[in-house]
């Protein structure tokens, strides 16, 4: 009882003559939901029809039936009996007869024994009700009374008996307050069913012993009447309180958690029509209840009902707006969730349902019954009972009396569905209207109650046809029908085309699509050709023709052509012109910090940066500055560029970046301070942007806009910052005008070209460290060789050197010296030289960076030259000389040559070595046929400029020049003319134009075969076949399968002629047989595959000795050093600046030895005087390249000794480049980047891990590349064995070999070699492998 308390209350019966007030349970005098009476009272009712006699439980003083009977007569379906807390189920209990009043129904569960039921005839019904109220209030408490059900029955005299029935449905799921047996509950249900069988049944209680098995007690035998006086105190033991959780109406599916709400629902939903009919016919006495809704006549309800025909009806009252929702009839069960028990509140404070028509019961048309009064009764079921089974409801006895007086012939009454049902008690008063707010009203004001306050336009609806699927409105019924048919399966958000399979989620998209089938848009402007899919667009467009708009000023026409100010080429876009302008400039602003390359375009620069990104693992790339990792190279590059952005000024509030600080300050002031600096002069408008202010003035102050616009002119649209300034454009114009090459020679004299004055050093050293620089290769021309052949031979050696491409901007020169006898033989055919013309002639070949070559011949008097005498070379019986000019202090005057003549014999033994040939802007003194001199200046681009003829000595003859590079597009260079007179007379001699493509000097009467053979620079060492390119020569050498046989290196095909194999190899050119086993990369040769494999291993074997950065290619390392760690783009050899070239005069062999010893010792300290003497006593050729060794530790010494001990070459390298070689006479010079020799007589040249040249000894077999295996060098291996050294000891150059071995054995010559030595070599960027030759 304490845990499950139930509130219950009752009101005292009102006295006759007093105004009727509503009770707490919601029932009044005239609205009882269950009235029970015996059959004797029912028989005395006058004027009852046959249908009335069939009722059950009629009152003794009225002809109306009870609520339960009406429900039973209407519904043909059995309702669930689990919901007992219903007002109609009260009459099914046993009857307690009370003297002086009608029998009162008592629930069987309240009686522990039927025999205990007491009947007291003397006790009044009011006293009984008061006594029961007191018992329940004392037992349960007044705060729990509201949850109990009260049933009131009235007498004609006004006395009422109130009986309290505490019920609980079996499906409520709430715990019972006290133990109530299931059999007792079954007895109650059986009694209810028994009472429905006939009107004269008397409710009795049977003894438990007399009940048949399985039958309820109320059906077995009526109980004996109780005649003893009712003990009011004893009733307390007869009461049992049960927790009430839910109440259900049996006439419909309405449910409620409180009894008062259910009773109010039954009174207003099911009993209101009977009261309305009675009041209208008999003039009901008394005023209308204050809490009831005002009764409306049929005439009053008619107009509003017609207006609301299309509303969706609702079948349930809502007593709480916040917690209850519209009831769904399909949900019969509470789905296991128990409703929260609410504490009842006074009716004035209780939330009311929103007024309006019921939402869930279908409304039927009103039928006139008995003078047009009454409506047909509507049940919750779809089928109705026959009219004879439908009964009238009698809310109270007083109402039934009125009905009996005015109309006994009423057949049936209906259920009122007026708007006033469930209205608040104060609905008669004028509703309080809240102050109207702007905007859309709240949801609480969307009901019909507030419709009268809405604004109703007198105009008819523009679109009267409404789609009930999606809510769209249309102008015509045809449009509505087409729209409804287009709905896909009734989906409001999906439309389909009726002529094709098109689907859309927008109605507008479907309309636009439908005109693809029609071919034209439906709406067209009457004054122009404008058409649209929508009529509203045409109406909006028509305003253009109807009103006089003020024309805006014509916008500034956009430029469609952008001419280049330099060359005049026209582009349609500004950015195209900007890109083109970069081609006129030599500036490369984007430089790679890894390899030093520069680029004009940023896009090309970014694409280049992708080559430096290396994979970490599994094709993933990691940022160099943070821990960011991704799988896309471009994404990583963009991320890394954010670390090193070229816009250093970044906003601290947003991602904005800029390259100017004032731009950043302006950005912060406008965007992040909230300031609006642009204010209107005519109003209070202000904005952050100037363009918005202009738009505001033009729209809001149109009359003043013209004047305002004159004071604030519109700025032209800002374009991208120009790439070139006006000054730069003018400079480019001047360069472009002078670009078409040197002008043609004219007959008149040219203005003298002022040379840069020479500044001799203050303290010249004995010999510069780079005295052997310039990559000047010295060859002696034999008597049987022509000048062209000698030049070609020298150039072949030069171009075959791998160091040729490492010099960068440094120019290369090849000087070919001709002896006196050869020179006299060559020049005799042209003219007879004078007696003094015995100076040897020098042929100088200048190779510029662009690839062009220029050959020149000159003669110099050797009297004032610094000389080095060397024995005759092996190529001819005569001696040879290399002559270049020392720095000239002044121009040659007309008085004669500045150098004195020497006997020819001495001149033949003279040699001068210096590095001035490679310096651009240097003046060289070159002689013609006689002893006269002239000056030639080498410019930076490789061209030769001649001084003015006025500055030359009389009788000077121009040398013969010939261009050996590819032909230029511009006009040929012609030399100035000068008259030359023999024997005091002057004559003219003009150098021939450089029209020949052959390399070498154009010699008079030279055979055509010599000039033709010079076109092919490279020759095979096996078959002596010449080739124009090195690549073709290498392909030819790889195909050699013997002296007179060729084989395809990629397949078994072989032939005896090279052209056949070459044609066959062309079939393999498109194939890529070498594939990477880790990705889809494939290459045509193994070299590219090996280079590609480094990207997977992330191996970078080449490191920079300056900054420590590592590279996977040696070429990248060299380019990096040249661009970043050099002065003016040249490689750094020493930390000090290079001193001007000096030439030292050596007139004896002792001075020569001393000078060479000093030079070698200052650089490397490897060769002594005796060893140099031994080396120079033999026939050697010194080949020198520019030296970049800064100290002794950076030098590396490599020794080559063949197995027979006949050939020795001593290579001194630094920075992975050959510095110089001292080799035996007659040995072909191999200058590789990486040089390894095996003791089988194979001289193998290796460049970047790829064999580029193999020299075979006599009688050795030829090997294919597949037969060569690369084995890494281990510290225990020896490149030069002791047996090889012993064999070399018997050769003619043992001293040189010993000297080289003495320096090299610390690195890799003896057994004591340690891993640190190998690491030292690898740190220097030199990788050496032992190459093993296999016989298979």
Curated annotation (Swiss-Prot):
InterPro entries to which the protein is assigned, alphabetical: Zinc_finger/UBP_domain, Znf_C2H2_sf, Znf_C2H2_type
Signal sequence, start to end: none
Keyword Repeat applies: yes
Biased composition (Basic and acidic residues): 362-373
Assigned GO CC terms: histone methyltransferase complex; nucleus
Biased composition (Acidic residues): 300-331
Biased composition (Low complexity): 31-45, 54-65, 339-349
Keywords for the protein's UniProt record, in alphabetical order: Activator, Developmental protein, DNA-binding, Isopeptide bond, Metal-binding, Nucleus, Phosphoprotein, Repeat, Transcription, Transcription regulation, Ubl conjugation, Zinc, Zinc-finger
Region of interest (Disordered), ranges: 1-108, 199-222, 282-398, 415-442, 732-766, 961-1013
Similarity-based family: Belongs to the krueppel C2H2-type zinc-finger protein family.
Protein name (database record): Zinc finger protein 335
Species for this entry: Rattus norvegicus (Rat)
């Amino acid at each position: 009882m304490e845990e499950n308390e139930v509130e219950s209350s009752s009101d005292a019966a009102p006295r006759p003559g007093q105004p009727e007030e509503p009770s707490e349970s919601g029932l009044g005098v005239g609205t009882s939901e269950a009235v029970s009476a015996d059959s004797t009272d029912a028989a005395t009712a006058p004027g009852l029809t046959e249908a009335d006699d069939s009722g059950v439980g009629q009152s003794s003083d009225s002809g109306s039936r009870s609520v339960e009977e009406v429900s039973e007569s209407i519904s043909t379906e059995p309702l669930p009996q689990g919901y007992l807390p219903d007002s109609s189920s009260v009459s099914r209990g046993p009857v307690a007869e009370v003297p002086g009043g009608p029998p009162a129904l008592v629930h069987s569960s309240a009686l522990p024994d039927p025999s205990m039921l007491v009947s007291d005839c003397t006790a009044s019904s009011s006293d009984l009700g008061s006594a029961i109220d007191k018992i329940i209030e004392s037992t349960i408490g007044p705060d729990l009374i509201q949850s109990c059900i009260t049933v009131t029955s009235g007498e004609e005299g006004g006395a009422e008996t109130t009986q309290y029935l505490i019920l609980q449905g079996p499906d409520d799921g709430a715990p019972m307050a006290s133990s109530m047996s299931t059999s007792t509950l079954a007895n109650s249900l059986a009694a209810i069913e028994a009472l429905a069988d006939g009107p004269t049944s008397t409710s009795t209680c049977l003894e438990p012993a007399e009940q048949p098995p399985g039958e309820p007690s109320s059906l077995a035998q009526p109980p004996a009447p109780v005649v003893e006086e009712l003990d009011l105190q004893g009733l307390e033991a007869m009461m049992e309180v049960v927790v009430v959780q839910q109440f259900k109406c049996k006439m419909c599916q309405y449910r409620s958690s409180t009894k008062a709400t259910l009773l109010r629902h039954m009174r207003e939903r099911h009993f209101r029509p009977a009261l309305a009919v009675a009041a209208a016919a008999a003039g009901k006495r008394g005023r209308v209840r204050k809490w009831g809704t005002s009764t409306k006549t049929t005439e009053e309800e008619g107009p509003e009902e017609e207006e609301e025909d299309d509303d969706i009806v609702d079948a349930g009252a809502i007593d709480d707006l916040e917690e209850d929702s519209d009831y769904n009839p399909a949900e019969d069960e509470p789905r296991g969730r128990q409703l929260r028990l609410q504490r009842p509140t006074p009716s004035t404070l209780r939330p009311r349902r929103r007024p309006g028509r019921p939402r869930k019961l279908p409304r039927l048309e009103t039928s006139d019954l008995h003078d047009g009064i009454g409506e047909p009764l509507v049940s919750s079921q779809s089928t109705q009972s026959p009219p004879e089974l439908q009964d009238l409801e009698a809310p109270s006895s007083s109402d039934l009396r009125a009905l009996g007086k005015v109309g006994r012939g009423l057949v049936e009454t209906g259920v009122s569905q007026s708007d006033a049902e469930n209205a608040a008690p104060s609905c008669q008063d004028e509703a309080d209207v809240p102050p109207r707010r702007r905007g859309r009203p709240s949801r609480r004001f969307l009901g019909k109650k507030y419709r009268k306050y809405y604004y109703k336009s007198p105009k008819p609806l523009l679109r009267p046809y409404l789609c009930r699927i999606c809510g769209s409105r249309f102008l015509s019924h045809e449009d509505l029908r087409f729209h409804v048919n287009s709905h896909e399966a009734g989906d409001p958000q999906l439309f389909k085309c009726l002529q094709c399979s098109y689907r859309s989620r927008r109605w507008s998209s479907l309309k636009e699509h439908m005109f693809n089938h029609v071919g034209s848009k439906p709406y067209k402007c009457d004054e122009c050709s404008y058409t649209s899919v929508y009529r509203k667009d045409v109406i909006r467009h028509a305003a253009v023709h109807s009103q006089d708009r003020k024309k805006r000023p014509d916008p500034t026409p956009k430029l469609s052509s952008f001419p280049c100010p330099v060359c005049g080429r026209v582009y349609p876009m500004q950015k195209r012109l900007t890109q083109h302008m970069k081609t006129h400039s030599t500036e490369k602003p984007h430089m790679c910090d890894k390899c030093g390359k520069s680029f004009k375009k940023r896009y090309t620069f970014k694409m280049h940066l992708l080559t430096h990104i290396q994979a970490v693992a599994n094709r993933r790339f990691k940022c160099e500055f943070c821990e960011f990792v991704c799988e896309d190279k471009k994404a990583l590059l963009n991320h890394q560029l954010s670390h090193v952005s070229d816009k250093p000024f970044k906003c601290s509030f947003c991602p904005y970046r800029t390259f100017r600080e004032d731009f950043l300050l302006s950005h912060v002031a406008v965007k992040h301070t909230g300031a609006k600096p642009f204010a209107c002069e005519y109003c209070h408008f202000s904005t952050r942007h100037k363009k918005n202010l202009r738009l505001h003035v033009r729209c809001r102050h149109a009359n003043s806009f013209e004047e305002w616009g004159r004071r604030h002119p519109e700025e032209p649209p800002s374009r991208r910052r120009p790439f070139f300034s006006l000054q730069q454009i003018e400079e480019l114009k001047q360069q472009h005008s002078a670009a078409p090459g040197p002008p043609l020679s004219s007959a008149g004299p040219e203005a003298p070209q002022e040379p840069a004055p020479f500044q001799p050093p203050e303290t010249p050293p004995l010999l510069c460290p780079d005295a052997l620089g310039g990559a000047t290769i010295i060859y002696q021309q034999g008597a049987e060789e022509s000048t062209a052949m000698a030049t070609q031979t020298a150039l072949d050696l030069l171009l075959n050197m791998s160091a040729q491409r490492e010099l960068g901007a440094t120019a290369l020169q090849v000087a070919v010296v001709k002896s006196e006898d050869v020179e006299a033989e060559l020049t005799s055919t042209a003219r007879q030289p004078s007696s003094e013309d015995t100076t040897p002639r020098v042929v100088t070949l200048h190779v510029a960076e662009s690839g062009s070559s220029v050959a020149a011949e000159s003669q110099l008097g050797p009297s004032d030259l610094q000389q080095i005498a060397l024995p005759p070379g092996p190529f001819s019986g005569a001696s040879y000389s290399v002559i270049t000019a020392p720095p000239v202090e002044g121009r040659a005057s007309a008085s004669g040559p500045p150098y004195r003549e020497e006997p020819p014999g001495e001149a033949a033994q003279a040699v001068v070595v210096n590095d001035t040939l490679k310096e651009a802007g240097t003046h060289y003194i070159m002689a013609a046929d006689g002893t006269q001199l002239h000056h030639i200046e080498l410019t930076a681009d490789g061209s030769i400029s001649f001084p003015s003829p006025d500055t030359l000595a009389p009788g000077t003859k121009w040398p013969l020049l010939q261009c050996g590079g590819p032909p230029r597009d511009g006009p040929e260079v012609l030399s100035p003319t000068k008259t030359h007179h023999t024997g005091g007379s002057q004559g003219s001699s003009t150098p021939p134009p450089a029209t020949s493509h052959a390399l070498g000097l154009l010699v008079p009467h030279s055979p055509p075969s010599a000039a033709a053979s010079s076109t092919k620079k490279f020759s095979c060492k096996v078959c002596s076949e010449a080739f124009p390119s090195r690549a073709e020569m290498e392909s030819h050498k790889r195909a050699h399968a013997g002296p007179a046989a060729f084989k395809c290196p990629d397949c078994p095909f072989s032939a005896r002629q090279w052209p056949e194999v070459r044609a066959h190899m062309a079939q393999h050119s498109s194939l890529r047989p070498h594939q990477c086993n880790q990705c889809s990369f494939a290459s045509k040769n193994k070299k590219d595959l090996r280079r590609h494999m480094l990207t997977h291993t992330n191996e970078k074997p080449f490191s920079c000795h300056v900054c420590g950065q590592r590279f996977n290619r040696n070429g990248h390392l060299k380019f990096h050093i040249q661009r970043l760690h050099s002065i003016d783009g040249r490689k750094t050899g020493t930390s000090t600046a290079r001193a001007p070239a000096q030439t030292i005069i050596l007139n004896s062999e002792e001075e020569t030895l001393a000078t060479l010893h000093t030079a070698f010792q200052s650089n490397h300290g490897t060769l002594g005087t005796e060893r140099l003497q031994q080396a120079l006593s033999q026939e050697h050729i010194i080949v020198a390249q520019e030296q970049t060794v800064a100290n002794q530790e950076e030098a590396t010494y490599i020794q080559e000794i063949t197995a027979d001990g006949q050939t020795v070459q001593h290579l001194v390298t630094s920075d992975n480049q050959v510095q110089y070689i001292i080799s035996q006479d007659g040995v072909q010079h191999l200058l590789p980047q990486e040089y390894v020799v095996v003791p089988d007589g194979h001289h193998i040249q290796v460049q970047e891990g790829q064999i580029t040249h193999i020299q075979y000894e006599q009688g050795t077999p030829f090997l294919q590349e597949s037969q060569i295996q690369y084995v890494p060098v281990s510290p225990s291996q020896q490149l030069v064995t002791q047996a090889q050294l012993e064999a070399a000891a018997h050769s003619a150059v043992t001293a040189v070999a010993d000297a080289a071995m003495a320096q090299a054995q610390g690195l890799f010559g003896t057994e004591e070699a340690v891993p640190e030595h190998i690491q030292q070599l690898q740190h220097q960027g030199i990788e050496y492998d032992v190459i093993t030759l296999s016989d298979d």
